[in-house]
Amino acid sequence: PFPGEKPKIRLLYREIVLGMRQDIVETKQEKLEKLTTAFGTAYPEQCGRTHMTAQAIKCFDALLADGTVVTVAGRVKSLRMMGKIGFAHIEDGSGKMQIFLSEQTTGLDAIKLFADTIEIGDFVEATGKVFLTKKDEKTIDVAAWRVLGKSMRPIPTEHFGLQDEEERLRRRYLDLLSNPETRDIFMKKNRFWQTVRTFLSERGYLEVQTPVLEHIPGGAEAEPFITHHNALDQDFYLRISLEL
């Protein structure tokens, strides 16, 4: 069963978010072929990034004053193409930044290729000088761009995200893509355990790995979870107490 309160919502979720509609897959395949023709490959081995988005935003005033050309790379999170101009937001591991494509700077052919082939979820590299929009948003005026990876399945949009709790747990990768709150929790946990490990390591403590599955259950009165190892034809127990 698919999530949603109404059958129509379930069907829409199945077709769009999970990418199970054949016409969507075929359209993406056509766009992939166009990108391959234009760039030689839609999945290059390297990118020429000079700044993370957070770094470009932090150093914005200096970059603007010097007229420095920067290159950022990341996943397209939003896209607004309007004929001879277009805006998009690129997100990397540090944050998100807006890019601007125009006929004057980017070139009409490059804009048309971007509009015809790039979708939310794709990875791109954008190069240009920074400027401030009329709405005071720090933006890159794109002089050149290229694809770094074509997403062959649609992802949940930035506005709606992935709201269904069951699907968020089942498809954790989509949850991390769509919901910054979930991603923030994972990052905080990672920093916490890194800090604990560093603190103890600097004081001479040794970290050891203990078995996850055991032949003999431990943990005093606690009832262990049991599983069967088919290849060994043996029962194993999930560890309860790490210290035992």
Residue ranges and their predicted role:
Residues 13-244:
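Class II aminoacyl-tRNA synthetase catalytic cores and aaRS-like
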Residues 1-19:
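N-terminal amphipathic/basic-hydrophobic helices that include classical n-h-c signal peptides
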